[in-house]
């Protein structure tokens, strides 16, 4: 028996003798088990919303139909959620149902019949130019803070999100043990989506700044700890205001978020001719096509530019 089959068989046995509601709760726990902490937090919220919807019509996951999924999607629309958010909810529910099917908890997978909507990504609207990013960082450096350490922290958060192209969940989860020296610089080990690990070599100037910021912090200490406790990471909800404040200082839109810096990392590298596989590796994209889209969002030329004036 292969390891995968053994795991599925074990999980099926764990669910078999439980009452319907207990089995449903255990199913969700097993589904969440191997996911990163940030994903577990969001997926728990999505699963709770879905099972509450089913409970409202007297059903459990084992009785789910395609019609239930359509109705749940409509409920999300009625809550005035944006389409990308609804897509995220439905993707999580499909993942849960797929897991339920693989473990034998359900006999057929209604989620397989549901297609997620294709969204207009408009990545070009979420890319800052290099001057804007430099301005965000420089003006933050010149801003008066009550505590100097908080200013240094905010500047390094801006730099890591942009220079290393990190996701916000990856940034807040960093511990000092993830930083490894290499010659005059060093690398940081990042655990991304799907618990996939990647290594990012940092430029020398950023490595030096990170080590100066570290001080006497221990290996297991969070790089950006919560002010409510040293053994807790900075909450991701507390990072967005740092980015928005920096954008406001630079006279940019209030819509600027952490992910804009990641988008900008990919776009600026593509425009500078950085090899696409290297960008993919640094950003942790599972599919090269995800990285390739950044090459085309701000073209330097097009066939339209080569036609005569009409």
Language model region names:
Residues 1-310:
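Conserved catalytic core of the tyrosine transesterase superfamily
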């Amino acid at each position: 028996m292969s390891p995968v089959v053994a795991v599925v068989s074990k999980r099926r046995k764990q669910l078999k003798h439980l009452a319907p509601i207990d089995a449903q709760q255990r199913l969700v726990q097993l589904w969440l088990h191997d996911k990163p902490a940030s994903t577990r937090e969001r997926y728990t919220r999505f699963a709770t919303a879905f099972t509450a919807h089913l409970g409202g019509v007297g059903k459990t996951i084992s009785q789910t139909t395609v019609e239930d999924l359509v109705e749940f999607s409509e409920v999300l629309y009625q809550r005035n959620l944006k389409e990308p958010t609804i897509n995220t909810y439905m993707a999580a529910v499909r993942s849960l149902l797929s897991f339920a099917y693989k473990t034998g908890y359900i006999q057929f997978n209604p989620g397989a019949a549901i297609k997620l909507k294709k969204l207009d990504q408009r990545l070009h609207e979420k890319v800052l130019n290099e001057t804007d990013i430099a301005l965000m960082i420089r003006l933050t450096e010149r801003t008066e803070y009550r505590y100097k350490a908080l200013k240094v922290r905010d500047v390094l958060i801006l730099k890591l999100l942009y220079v290393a192209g990190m996701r916000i969940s990856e940034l807040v989860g960093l511990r000092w043990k993830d930083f490894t020296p290499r010659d005059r610089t060093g690398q940081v080990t990042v655990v991304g989506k799907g618990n996939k690990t990647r290594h990012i070599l940092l430029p020398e100037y950023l490595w030096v700044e990170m080590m100066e910021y570290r001080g006497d912090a221990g290996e297991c200490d969070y790089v950006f700890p919560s002010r409510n406790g040293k053994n807790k990471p900075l909450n991701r909800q507390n990072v967005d205001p740092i980015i928005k404040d920096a954008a406001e200082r630079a006279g940019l839109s209030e819509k600027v978020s952490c992910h804009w810096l990641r988008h900008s990392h990919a776009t600026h590298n593509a425009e500078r001719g950085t090899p696409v596989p290297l960008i993919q590796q640094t950003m942790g994209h599972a599919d090269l096509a995800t990285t390739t889209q950044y090459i085309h969002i701000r073209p330097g030329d097009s066939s339209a530019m080569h036609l005569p004036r009409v």
